[in-house]
Amino acid sequence: MAKSKAYRAAAEKIDLTKAYTASEAVELARETGSSKFDSTVEVALKLGVDPRKADQMVRGTVILPHGTGKTARVIVFATGPAAEAAIAAGADEVGGDELIEKVAGGYTSFDSAVSTPELMGKVGRLGKVLGPRGLMPNPKTGTVTPDVARAVSDIKGGKIEFRVDKHANVHFVVGKASFSPEQLSENVGAALEEIVRLKPSSSKGRYVQKATVSTTFGPGIPVDVNSI
């Protein structure tokens, strides 16, 4: 597929023979982002793990110090006092059986789902709807919890999830092109620190093998993995 004129113009600013530091890459990403809208800045990593092995599955969450630039839409499966707490924390939609039935019918107009442990027996049956979209609540990411208010606050405050795919790649958002270079660099640093902390003990050799920074529809900017 032919690349757009804007893409080609952005690509010309990038020296593909050079590996940029993370701070240089985010600065360049800001410069090469679309002038028509506030582009999302993303990071992609290739990790030295074998995702087929359970002990090498890298998955986690991190609260970006400057958020993502987008207010996440969060639904919560809860009843009683927990539901009231979720509403007070700013959840966009809260409910028990009725909300479960709504999602079972195909409703997915949200960015994250949280559930109390008590309702997971029912929520777990929504796997066909939530699973493929990465929206199924999970204790490992803090989205199955008695403290649903805290979960909502964290997500609204810039919490992101990351998970290695079957090709050992990890993709995550670190902000908008309108962020300052310092804000983007600090967000990238926070995410990378957590991903490096989660390196499986059974992973041998170089852990972060390749890294790129890009904006929406923009070219990937190679990052020197030694700077990570």
Curated annotation (Swiss-Prot):
First and last residue of the signal peptide: none
MF annotations from Gene Ontology: rRNA binding; structural constituent of ribosome; tRNA binding
Summary of subunit composition and partner proteins: Part of the 50S ribosomal subunit.
Repressor found in the keyword field: yes
Naturally occurring in which organism (per UniProt): Clavibacter sepedonicus (Clavibacter michiganensis subsp. sepedonicus)
GO cellular component: large ribosomal subunit
Family designation: Belongs to the universal ribosomal protein uL1 family.
Biological process annotations from GO: regulation of translation; translation
Domain of life: Bacteria
HAMAP family: Ribosomal_uL1_B
Name this polypeptide is given: Large ribosomal subunit protein uL1
Entry keyword set: Repressor, Ribonucleoprotein, Ribosomal protein, RNA-binding, rRNA-binding, Translation regulation, tRNA-binding
Protein purpose: Binds directly to 23S rRNA. The L1 stalk is quite mobile in the ribosome, and is involved in E site tRNA release.
